[in-house]
Each structure stands twice: as structure tokens, then as C-alpha cells.
């Protein structure tokens, strides 16, 4: 049975470095990769990917844009990993990054978390150094911390 690995990304191009780390240290026949993007609840319009209404686009343009960027980043990451031969799934979850990452890692029974060490995108909070430190302090599994940028 494959080991489960959680990859916490953001919507910036720098997230590609985390996928590179995963491909370097994980093996398709040994690991199942779960891509996670934690999004601030301020920028959440829908719980699930869905088209935006004209009213939502007018009333919450920034939130619609951020959510769309996040959904695209997760889908792109999953595609890259699947193309490399990995069983991979992705999710964007609204909430505080530490809570989301720790919660998903526990729920999935992850044996490893891969994340960045500093803020890498305009989503702004996912990979802040304090976030990484808090995650490390709260989980009982190894955390592979990638270099940002």
C-alpha cells in the first residue's frame, strides 16, 4: 500500500519547486501524493469548484479571482504529478493554513508533508515561515521544507 504524502502549495509559480521535491524524493510505486492549497476564508466564494454568478463576480471580484487561481494551481499540480506517474489528488480547503494542513495530514494519515518555508504567493499565508514552524510543532510526521523562489 502506498505511503501518503501531503504537498502544501500556493498559487504562485514557486509552487513548482515543491512538486520537484516530491518527484525527487517520492516514487510513483511507493507514494500517493495529495496536493493541498489552504485558502483564507476571506477569499472563498464556493465550497466546491463551481461557476461564479454575475452577482458574485460583481460583488466579490477579488475573492472570485483568488479562488479561481487556487483551483487552477491545484489542478495543474495534480496534472504534473499524474503525468510523472504518481497517483495524485488535490483539494483547496478554506481556513487557517496551519489548521488546514495539520487537519488534512491527520485525516489522510500522511507519512510526510512537503511545504515551503516562506510566503510564496499573493495568497500570502500558506508558506510563511511561522506557518511551517507551527506545522512542524503540531505534527508527528516528517516535514520536508523546500526553499522558496
Predicted regions and their residues:
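Structural beta-alpha unit
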Residues: 1, 76-113
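Small/aliphatic-rich secondary-structure junction motif
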Residues: 1-59
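Short secondary-structure boundary segments
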Residues: 37, 116-118, 147-148
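Glycine-rich, Arg-bearing micro-motifs that act as flexible, cationic patches
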Residues: 112-137
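Short, flexible loop segments at boundaries between secondary-structure elements
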Residues: 140-149
Amino acid at each position: 500500500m502506498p505511503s501518503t504524502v501531503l504537498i502544501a502549495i500556493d498559487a504562485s509559480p514557486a509552487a513548482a519547486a515543491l512538486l520537484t521535491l516530491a518527484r525527487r524524493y517520492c516514487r510513483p510505486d511507493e507514494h500517493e501524493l495529495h496536493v493541498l492549497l489552504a485558502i483564507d476564508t476571506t477569499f472563498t466564494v464556493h465550497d466546491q469548484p463551481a461557476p461564479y454568478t454575475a452577482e458574485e463576480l460583481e460583488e466579490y471580484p477579488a475573492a472570485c479571482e483568488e479562488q479561481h487561481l487556487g483551483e487552477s494551481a491545484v489542478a495543474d499540480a495534480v496534472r504534473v504529478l499524474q503525468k510523472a506517474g504518481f497517483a495524485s489528488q488535490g483539494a483547496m480547503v478554506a481556513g487557517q493554513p496551519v489548521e488546514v494542513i495539520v487537519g488534512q495530514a491527520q485525516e489522510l494519515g500522511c507519512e510526510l508533508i512537503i511545504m515551503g518555508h516562506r510566503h510564496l504567493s499573493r495568497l500570502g499565508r500558506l508558506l510563511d515561515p511561522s506557518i511551517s514552524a507551527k506545522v512542524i510543532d503540531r505534527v508527528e510526521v516528517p516535514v520536508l521544507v523546500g526553499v522558496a523562489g
